[in-house]
Amino acid sequence: MKRTYLSLIAAGVMSLSVSAWSLDGVLVPESGILVSVGQDVDSVNDYASALGTIPAGVTNYVGIVNLDGLNSDADAGAGRNNIAELANAYPTSALVVGVSMNGEVDAVASGRYNANIDTLLNTLAGYDRPVYLRWAYEVDGPWNGHSPSGIVTSFQYVHDRIIALGHQAKISLVWQVASYCPTPGGQLDQWWPGSEYVDWVGLSYFAPQDCNWDRVNEAAQFARSKGKPLFLNESTPQRYQVADLTYSADPAKGTNRQSKTSQQLWDEWFAPYFQFMSDNSDIVKGFTYINADWDSQWRWAAPYNEGYWGDSRVQANALIKSNWQQEIAKGQYINHSETLFETLGYGSTGGGDNGGGDNGGTNPPEPCNEEFGYRYVSDSTIEVFHKNNGWSAEWNYVCLNGLCLQGEIKNGEYVKQFDAQLGSTYGIEFKVADGESQFITDKSVTFENKQCGSTGTPGGGDNGSGGDNGGDNGSGGDNGSGGGTDPSQCSADFGYNYRSDTEIEVFHKDLGWSASWNYICLDDYCVPGDKSGDSYNRSFNATLGSDYKITFKVEDSASQFITEKNITFVNTSCAQ
């Protein structure tokens, strides 16, 4: 349903008088600005790892014609899109999803892809978290080949399908303009579907200085005139190289690059960027920063056939990173927290890892003499590590209370930082591939203010108190169990049950293991299984008809039992 919040608008640029008005839309925070990052899976992961934080929002893309990027990898040279992977990696973050018309907006408007629209909406709603749907993003961008009639008709249809499918409290519809300087002003109305069909107005913020901020200011005023919140859906310091500290005024080929100091770069692009949000604080409620090495992605790389973009990674320069962390730590920004979904107006707060937003910068930790343990980063951040003992390591996971993320190799160690609470007890675990086998170790630790937490009790890595608080049953995690066929009634030892077209339950019968820990995995996304009757089971978001690898692993005294298989998700129970 629509939510209306009172806001204040300045009566003039220098005036102190104000008038009350309202912002109308779905999933609009009462106060604050949602911080999200994009725009490909690996760039999001690199940002989260480099800054030691869980983003409040994560951004990715899908094509409507083939739904490429929805449930598997799709890369058109601009980085990997895989919404399923991103949603599973960040179960307690909002999703910001751009939907490309693939140049066929009129065919979309004619109804040719209505089945795909339903699949898309049902899949996104199945993740049970706030979803900001950027339908036909950059509606007026000439490179997209959109028609005003196709935009208007398709927007109205998608809005009505969201309601018809019962997803109106989960999916917010964003109408995003390109804010492209070469585009003449005064043309936005022809693309507008109507206020009743739009929740947010979005814009792109790349090089607004090229036209004295005219296009972004026009978009902001348009949102204000419609009483809609404003989302900076795509923003990046175009033509700047953060790592190399250069700038080019040439948008086509990036020629004649000028050297910049890190402070100059910040002052020229980042400071005006945040000032734009401050100047429009009555309507700005969210932004997505594209944190990517554009030059490393072949679509954007030399010879720059689609323009020169640069390198926007904030972690590529110490001052830029520090300034960024200090800025978004301010009170007006909405970072990741256990109340994030509630803050965004979602129906429940969800579960999973309890973030506290950006943890700020830290000095590189000193290597420890012990093989496996933790080190204190801050009162709310723990770093779990294991020394690299030369495994083949096709994959590795570092875990805190069952939340397992891929570790980074730093200073001869696999490391990963997590949100944590000083004084709490946690289960930490490390697992890594080693040829045809794997190495797994875990212990229980109490998080204290010291660099190398060596005191730990061996045992189940998922038995601590804290960290992942009920992520299996919350709105941000996987879907829990319940309903459908009881796995104990199945003749198969290991398989899956159909729960719905978007939910699969993986199970394995209990064969009498000691089982101080167990994990059930879907495509290498591993979480502790629930013991129900004589079976271990776990539900995941999935898409009917798709292929998956399912895995079960369990501790058995001093050893472990592991089994896996490839399956196609069909509408059946007790599938082997």
UniProtKB/Swiss-Prot annotation:
Sequence ranges of Gly residues compositional bias: 347-360, 456-485
Catalytic activity from the UniProt record: Random hydrolysis of (1->3)-beta-D-glycosidic linkages in (1->3)-beta-D-xylans
Effect of E268Q: Catalytic activity reduced by 30%
Effect the entry attributes to changing E234D: Very low catalytic activity
Protein's recorded name: Beta-1,3-xylanase XYL4
Region named Carbohydrate binding module (CBM) 2: 487-574
Active site: E138 (proton donor), E234 (nucleophile)
EC number: 3.2.1.32
Segment forming the signal sequence: 1-22
Assigned protein family: Belongs to the glycosyl hydrolase 26 family.
Activity regulation (record text): Completely inhibited by Hg(2+), partially inhibited by Mn(2+), Cu(2+) and Pb(2+). Unaffected by Ca(2+), Mg(2+) and EDTA.
GO molecular function, one term: mannan endo-1,4-beta-mannosidase activity
Record keywords: Carbohydrate metabolism, Cellulose degradation, Disulfide bond, Glycosidase, Hydrolase, Polysaccharide degradation, Repeat, Signal, Xylan degradation
Gene: xyl4
Region called Disordered, residue ranges: 347-367, 450-486
Domain GH26, residue spans: 23-293
Disulfide-linked positions: C368-C452, C399-C404, C490-C574, C521-C526
Species name: Vibrio sp
Function: Catalyzes the hydrolysis of beta-1,3-xylan into oligosaccharides, mainly xylobiose, xylotriose and xylotetraose. Converts beta-1,3-xylotriose into xylose and xylobiose, converts beta-1,3-xylotetraose mainly into xylotriose and xylose, converts beta-1,3-xylopentaose into xylobiose and xylotriose. Does not hydrolyze beta-1,4-xylan, beta-1,4-mannan, beta-1,4-glucan, beta-1,3-xylobiose or p-nitrophenyl-beta-xyloside.
Effect of E138D: Very low catalytic activity
Pfam families attached to this UniProt entry: AlcCBM31
InterPro entries the record matches: Beta-xylanase (IPR021016), Beta-xylanase_CBM31_sf (IPR038560), GH26_dom (IPR022790), Glyco_hydro_26 (IPR000805), Glycoside_hydrolase_SF (IPR017853)
Thermal behavior of activity: Optimum temperature is 37 degrees Celsius. Inactive above 60 degrees Celsius.
Region ranges (Carbohydrate binding module (CBM) 1): 363-453
Domains: entry comment: The carbohydrate binding modules (CBM) bind to insoluble beta-1,3-xylan, but not to insoluble beta-1,4-xylan, beta-1,4-glucan, beta-1,4-mannan, curdlan, chitin, or soluble polysaccharides.
pH dependence: Optimum pH is 7.0-7.5.
GO biological process: cellulose catabolic process; substituted mannan metabolic process; xylan catabolic process
